[in-house]
Structure formats: C-alpha cells, structure tokens
C-alpha cells in the first residue's frame, strides 16, 4: 500500500493539485485520501480506482510468472 500511496502523492504533486482538490474531484473523503497517500488503511477497490482515474492512472493485474 505504501508504494501506491507514493505514486498517488507524486502524481498529485506533478499535476499541482492539493489533497482537498483531489478528494473532491475523486469523490472520496479527505481523511481517506490522506490515509491512502500515507500508505495506511485498507481502502475499497472502488475508492482506489476513483483516485487513480482522477489522476490519469490505472491499475493493472498480471499473472505471476
């Protein structure tokens, strides 16, 4: 979760969007967003996908080799 949080933080900063703006655009609570960005908590997949989509990111699932 920490790696995802780091990616979210870096992308948000590169887009020059603050946490409150991102939480509103993604339709998630500010406390939820802050926890995810810190690599904490256990967010619902729907919440995580909403944040990623808002940032222009996507999550990929691959088979182990």
Residue ranges of predicted features:
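Positions in alpha-helical segments
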Residues: 6, 31-34
